């Protein structure tokens, strides 16, 4: 499998330094992608870089994932208009361990193969590096003129950020350049890959290697992922879509991919899955014949959810989706954990009832008309119940005055009322 050709048909090449393809054709290459460790989970904004490493390893090359412990303590001017918070070492090590666990779902760290993946942290070689070392081994090789010419620096200096550009952030490209030099010298790493906004920082590294060692190193960047409508990829109203289920439930994760537009699904299935070209071309053709069936979105959501979470989590997410949009049973509803239940019914009207009152038993008509405004009147409710149009926890309400107790609660806390086909209400016992 040819790595560059694989990335090209997937739309994952933005810039590539001349000679990169020739290098990859003649030897097993070691390359790295940098990962920001400011959180203890990756989010889907990291996935393009991770998938590049995955394809790289599948093509027989050796991937390094570099945790930017030292650089993460500083900040990067290439895309952030504001400086980042600093990390302490304990937090950094915790975040690193969590991130490696997530990366292990994409990369082989464990085998004895010569191209097994490695995780490195630039804090390990920067923490003892003095300012005098830095000035002598890095600073003297790169001119300020060279640094000022970088697009990311120009933007900050030209007033895009009110606070200007600190010296710390200005030197970021030298620190990242030194990472490349260090990995070149210690790991034989000849290629750095990253998002297109990193081109300036990466080429500082190739320049540093050339000027200090007379060595040849290379750069490859992928496009920044966008949405067809111009919106920011990977962000929702509630923030990032995280890989850690503590921050984004598998159900919400699955729903994110399921709900992308047709145009985005066609691009994302190439970038975020390992499906081969023939299969993806077949899926696109099938989708174009019947877009309303959302074949691409369903397959994309399945592949990414299984890869990041598990087959079991994927099946649970599908079942949860069917509760809202299909003919699910009360048994399926009862299987939902509290987080998924709340995620599925996010935004539906909510009402509260006293747990004590419910323990004694409350007639449905009193609960749904007087306590919770599910119905405007008892007459309206009676008519709908008689027509089989009212359900409690996905079971048809048997009678207008059916008694509801704490035994009916889901997760010992919730009652789900459905009026007609599409109107849901959540009653919370407190």
Curated annotation (Swiss-Prot):
Residues 362-429 form the S4 RNA-binding domain. It comes from the Bacteria. Gene3D superfamilies: HUPs, RNA-binding S4 domain, Tyrosyl-Transfer RNA Synthetase. The keyword Ion transport does not apply. Its EC number is 6.1.1.1. Homodimer. Belongs to the class-I aminoacyl-tRNA synthetase family. TyrS type 1 subfamily. This is Tyrosine--tRNA ligase. The gene is tyrS.
